[in-house]
């Protein structure tokens, strides 16, 4: 997580003159990853995004682990590090993330295909520098925009996860809220940590009463954040 910031609530109630409630939090993510623990040790390597706060203040790591055999869980956090500075060696990456697969519900989906009213969006991504999910810079969020509507625009930063053991490869999965029957157009925007972008446009038709085929059900423990 990037360094702590002060968040001010909207104060929707105007019944009194009291100030809006404020609190501190770590809302901006630098990196999310997972790996196996070997002999009690694990490690991550990643490139810090351009879109950090450069505050030179403490960040925060949230850690979670589970023993797949016993089911025992462990969690904790670490904040003895500073977020800031710029590397002396700059990256030369000028290419946006590669969208290796994009579909609704399952991999048999084709552009213009029929789906149910609540389709499941999936995109498989790769980028040599890393995908940007910081949420700290305007216009660099991972977004799904349907019918060019602000009401049907969804920030997918928190739905992205890296695939273990595959550098730069990740997947985003998002259950789209109920849509009106008929034809729709969607744009999927994704940025890398050096602010190169990729956009994919696709179409689909929502058919009321159509049900997706269930291939498998897998339950996994929640990740501490």
Segments (PLM) and residue ranges:
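Conserved catalytic region of serine esterases and O-acyltransferases that act on ester linkages
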Residues: 1
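Long, low-complexity serine/threonine/glycine- and acidic-rich segments characteristic of extracellular
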Residues: 6-85, 101-104, 108, 122-208
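Intrinsic-disorder/low-complexity coil detector
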Residues: 48, 96, 118, 174-176, ...
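Extracellular interdomain linker/stem segments of modular secreted and single-pass surface proteins
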Residues: 83-96, 206-214
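Surface-exposed, proline-anchored Ser/Thr-rich loop/turn motifs
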Residues: 99-106, 114, 209-225
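Short, solvent-exposed beta-strand/turn "edge" segments of beta-rich domains on protein surfaces
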Residues: 110-118
